[in-house]
C-alpha cells in the first residue's frame, strides 16, 4: 500500500518491512532511523519536521499519490488539505476518548487509571477525536512512572498500527465507531506551577503526581528554600504525628518523611533544580535535616 507517513521513523521502517511503499515521509526526529528511512523513500520525499501547513509540503504529499496517510507520534495537527488527499489513521497511547491530547501518560497515572492502552483511530480536523478503529487495553502497574508506561505501550502501539494498515491494504478496513463525547477527557501539557506538589493532598495522590511527572519534567517542592524535583516517593503511616502537612522530619532509619493531608510520604529519589544533580534518599534526608536546623 502507498503510504504518506508522519511521525517517528521506526513505524515507517516497520511498515516498509511489511511490504508497504512509503511514498512520502515526514519525520519528527533525526538520527539513524531517519537516515534509514530516507534510503527507502524516493529522493526529495523525506523531510525532517516540515511545516505541514506549507503549500509546498501539501503539494509534495499530493504528488506522491498515497492511498493512506499514517500518523504515529507526529506532534502537530495535520491540516485538512492533507487529510483530504487520502484516508488518514493514527494511534494514540490511551483508550480514547479518555485522555485526548499531548500528555496521556501523565494523566493516566495521575488519575489513578487501572487500565490504559492504545487506540487506532481515523484522523480528522481535531486532535484525537476521530472514529475508533481498534483498541488494545493494558493493565497499568501502579509502580510505573511515565517513562515506564510509555515503553510498555510502544510495542502494542506498533503492533496495532501494522495490523490496521494491513487490513486497509487487504481491502478490509476495520469498521469505525464514533467516540463517545460524554466519556471524553483531556490530557493537556502542564505548566510549571501545575507540577508543584500540594501537601494538602493524600499521600497516594502525591505519589501518583510524582510518578506521572517522572522522570521529566518532574513534580517539585521546596525544601529549606531549595527547589527539589521528586522522582520517587512512597506513602507511609510511619511518621511523627506532631507534623503538620508540608512539614518534614527524618526518621530513625534515616529516611525523610513529609506529612501530607492524609498520611505521609517517604522521600526516596529526586533531582536538584540548581544543577540537575541526582539526589539519593540520603541526600534528601540531609536537606530535610539542614532545613530543620535553619
Per-range role (PLM):
Residues 238-245:
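Short, solvent-exposed secondary-structure boundary/capping segments
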Residues 1-217, 221, 226, 235, ...:
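One-carbon transfer enzymes
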